[in-house]
Amino acid sequence: MTYDEIRKEARELWLQFFRDAWRECQYEAEFAEFIGTHELKSEKKVVDKLQPWLHILDDSIQWLANLWAILDRRAYGQQEASSQLKCAWVLLGASCAHAAAVRRLVLSGLDGPARAAARALDEHLSACIAMLHDDELAAGFQATESPDEFWYRNLNTKALKKHLNAVESNCGLDASISTDMREWRHGELRTFSQTVHPSYLAAALTMKTFAADAPETVANAILGSASAASERTLDFACKTIWYFSRFGFFLIYNGYGGRPAILQLDKEDEMHQMVVVGRDVLSVLNRKYWEYEIYPEQNGSGDNG
């Protein structure tokens, strides 16, 4: 069926039912075009107002996609590939999609849904680190027929924290920094979870949002509106990918606990060059702007969270 065919069929139904009700038709046939125009206006405001985080996310997605492409060359169609390789392959691929969803939704002015995608991004990248840390966990993850049960048993907050702490310690991260990072992540996830499980406040702040171009004002956001709250969303997504670039990358190219790495560095390969150099670029950008605030008055009051 073509777009014109279903559009004609639907319009005729609207006209018929309004006619049967003895009322003038109120149907807006150009509503899809209206939404498209609305999205373009939001996108321009986001690009203008939500830097540096939007650009850093673009670079982060490019880095993540290159790393996935290297894994894809190794894993796709290879029956003998290890569970760790295959788990990293699928989890990084899904992470790329979630990161792209964060970007697209923020540009469209849909910050609430973007936060749900950012939460999924964090869960996938954290799970990937856990799989790279524990080969038995990776084997179980690949083979399980009850993914929900496996997740709650093996990748709950406490279990995941154990894996992340072990990896950070092995990489020489100071314990106090590890604690601070864990507390920050926990606080952000608690806020972002409000977009997944309905609450009155989260629903209200998805419906209406502080405008990116005038943060002292509130805008209707039911169809999307560039949001000042998206600063926090983009910031979290960028730092989540940065965290993986430090620790997940290390495990991919170095292995853990005496186990061999799942990738061997090829200094002449362009994609390998991209992920090695990009890892350092992302580190410099994120550390430079770690505490940068576009809307300090919003962040100080908890913005939309």
Locations of the language-model features?
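A cross-kingdom marker of C-terminal helix-rich interaction/assembly modules
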Residues: 1-118, 137-305
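Short, charge-rich amphipathic alpha-helical segments embedded
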Residues: 116, 123-139
